[in-house]
Structures are given as structure tokens and as C-alpha cells.
A protein has these predicted regions:
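C-terminal region of N-terminal signal peptides and the immediate post-cleavage residues
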Residues: 23-26, 236
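Structural recognition of the beta-propeller blade-terminating site
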Residues: 74, 123, 163, 203, ...
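Aromatic (tryptophan-biased) beta-strands that constitute blades/sheets of beta-rich domains
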Residues: 26-50, 62, 79-86, 118-120, ...
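N-terminal secretory signal peptides that target proteins for export/translocation
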Residues: 1-4
Length: 367
């Protein structure tokens, strides 16, 4: 792989945010236990659901539809608050903060042979466009938002930081590899996985490359940072751990197929693999604590709580909760149809929200 020197446009200093705000089901003062009976509270029916994970600020769920529409649903009752045309097909999963929803789309260029991209900030209250940026290539995977910036990777090999108030480019780096993953912001760094198998740790303030680590498969899933270590999965079938500061290899653990997502928990590292198994590994050495076979491939990260983890296997009609202690099944949520969406489950204040082929469904504890 050939590396080009990063081209910094402008630098900023921004603070780190909590990792995976939508992954944990444990909420302050209102903890949701996944092993308890959960019932369907609302359902938004649509034949246009997509594989992109919705964004949430705990009170509203922002769902990107396949026809280029973003719908804002009340997290409590599923009521439609607003909908907005995004100006093209979605090319990445959205992100949300206290002010805006950030969406990436793609459209055909003037010659019809190339795809171009846009990045928009939409008002959370109305869906009105606050600003828009046009790009030479679509953004891919997912967007990540922090105190002052929006971070994303493009199909062209560009990694970006944008000012989230204006859309102005803060920095951009050009690499000879394609991005199609889920960037993570932690500890003053932004972590990007590439299709060519590289994990890049970039300085959050200016985009400078701090270190890189190579695997033998695409890195498309989320990256977890905890206790001075970085955990991630690769399409080469391994779960990896390396040092946060240096990128030095710590351990790797083989699974039977591509690893689509990892989550770092107090008791270990939870990994989802396309071999139909969920793996729970020790954080220190990567030793397998347990693994559990599920009835379908696991394409996305699970939702976790203190008592378990909820997975959305493909080609099944249910979501399954496994115990974090031993991997045994604890609960099942019936979806009413075979699931073929790779959108990850998310959590609002007290609800688990799931995307299926024809609906967005919210489950909560039985009253």
C-alpha cells in the first residue's frame, strides 16, 4: 500500500466523546435489562428501510430510508415528527448531536460515470438544511461527530474533518485506499479502518497519521478503545488488540469468518462474526471466555446492557439476547418477518430500536 503525505487544510482542537453512545442499553437512572420481558411499543412500517443504522439522541430516532428520505420518529411512541429529502441516496449512516443531524448522500456526476457526494447538517427540530458541502466522492460507512467536528472517510481514499457549525473542511488526508467503515473518536484521535485492511490512528486536531496497523482483510466495523488498548475486527477473520498510544500488536484471536463488529466491555471484548458465532474474549490476552452459535450471520454490532447483549442475526425472524456471563440465550424478540437488514440495533432512553426489511420497531420492558 502506498501512502501519501497528509494534506492539512486547517487544524482545530476538540474534546473526546464517549465511545458508542448508542450501543449500551444501560441508562443512568433508567436501566434497561435485556433479559427481562420486552414488548413491542411501536412500529414504523416502510418498504424503504435500509442497511444504514439509524441515529438517535435518546428522544428522537433518525431513520435513513432507501429512497433518500430521512424520517424523524418520536422515540417514545414512534410518531413522525418530520421528514426531509436528503438530496440523493444515502451513502453512510447518519450521526446526531445536540444541534443537528448529519447525513451523507451520493449522486451521479455530470458524466454519469462517476459518483459525487454531499454532506448536510439538518436541524433536529425541523429537518431544514443548515448547511451543505459537495464532495468529489461519496462518504462511506458511517459518520462520527465530536465536540466541534464531523469525521468521515470517502470512497476516494480521503479522510475528512468538517466544522460541524459551518461545514468548512478542517483537514483532509489523501490515502491510496478506500474507506467504508465506522470511524471512532477517542483520546484525541480518530480511528479509521480501510478496505485494504489498515487501521489508521489520526491526530484529531490536524489529521496527522500517528500510527497504522495492517491486517489481511477490510476493516468495516466499529473500533473500540478502552484501557489503553484498541480493539477491532477484520474481514481476515481475526479480532485484534493493539496499544492505543503506539499501535503495537498485543494479541489477535481467530474466528471462522469476517469479524463485523467488536464492543469493549468491563469483562471482555464481544465480537460478532459472519461465521454465525458471537465471541467473548479476555481483554488482556484475547483468550476465549465463551462463544455461542446463533441461527444466522451477525452483520452488525450488538446492543449491550449489564445483563446481556442483543444480536440481530440475518435470515431469522427474531433478535436474540445472550448472557454476558456464559453466552447462554436469555431472551428473544419476535420480529414478525425474516430479517435481512444489516443495520445495527440502537437504544433510546428506555427502548431498543430494531430495523428490519419492512419496519423500524421499538421494544421496551413490560409494564
Amino acid at each position: 500500500m502506498h501512502w501519501r503525505i497528509p494534506r492539512c487544510v486547517l487544524s482545530i482542537v476538540v474534546g473526546a466523546v464517549a465511545l458508542f453512545p448508542a450501543v449500551s442499553a444501560a441508562k443512568r437512572g433508567n436501566e434497561l435489562f435485556l433479559s427481562n420481558p420486552l414488548t413491542l411499543r411501536w412500529q414504523y412500517t416502510s418498504d424503504q428501510t435500509s442497511n444504514f443504522t439509524p441515529a438517535t439522541d435518546t428522544t428522537t430516532v433518525y431513520v435513513p430510508l432507501a429512497d433518500g428520505t430521512l424520517v424523524a420518529l418520536d422515540a417514545g411512541d414512534g410518531r413522525l415528527r418530520w421528514k426531509a429529502e436528503a438530496g440523493g441516496d444515502f451513502s453512510a449512516a447518519p450521526a446526531v448531536d445536540e444541534r443537528a443531524v448529519y447525513v451523507a448522500t451520493q449522486y451521479a456526476g455530470a458524466d454519469k460515470n462517476t459518483m459525487r457526494g454531499t454532506l448536510r447538517a439538518l436541524s433536529k427540530d425541523t429537518g431544514i438544511t443548515l448547511w451543505m458541502r459537495t464532495l468529489s466522492a461519496p462518504l462511506r460507512g458511517s459518520l462520527a461527530v465530536d465536540g466541534a467536528g464531523v469525521f468521515a472517510g470517502a470512497a476516494s481514499g480521503n479522510s475528512y474533518a468538517f466544522d460541524k457549525l459551518t461545514g468548512r473542511t478542517l483537514w483532509v488526508n489523501q490515502y491510496a485506499d478506500e474507506f467504508d467503515g465506522q470511524p471512532t473518536v477517542a483520546g484525541g484521535r480518530v480511528y479509521f479502518g480501510t478496505v485494504g485492511g489498515w487501521l489508521l490512528a489520526l491526530d484529531q486536531s490536524n489529521g496527522n497519521l500517528m500510527w497504522r496497523y495492517r491486517t489481511r482483510g477490510a476493516i468495516r466495523g466499529p473500533i473500540a478503545v478502552a484501557n489503553d488498548s484498541v480493539f477491532f475486527g477484520s474481514a481476515d477473520g481475526f479480532v485484534y488488540a493493539c496499544r492505543e498510544l503506539s499501535g503495537k500488536h498485543v494479541w489477535k484471536h481467530r474466528t471462522g469468518a469476517a469479524v463485523e463488529a467488536v464492543v469493549a466491555l468491563n469483562g471482555g471484548v464481544l465480537a460478532s462474526s459472519l461465521d454465525n458465532y458471537a465471541y467473548f474474549l479476555s481483554r488482556k490476552k484475547g483468550a476465549m471466555l465463551w462463544r455461542q452459535l446463533l441461527p444466522g450471520r451477525i452483520p452488525a454490532r450488538p446492543v449491550t446492557a449489564s445483563d446481556g447483549a442483543l444480536f440481530m442475526p440475518l435470515s431469522t425472524d427474531s433478535a436474540i439476547v445472550l448472557s454476558l456471563k456464559n453466552g447462554k440465550p436469555l431472551n428473544t424478540l419476535q420480529l414478525g418477518e425474516e430479517n435481512n437488514s444489516s443495520a445495527a440495533p440502537i437504544v433510546t432512553s428506555d427502548r431498543v430500536v430494531l430495523t428490519t426489511a419492512h419496519a423500524v420497531m421499538a421494544f421496551a420492558a413490560s409494564r
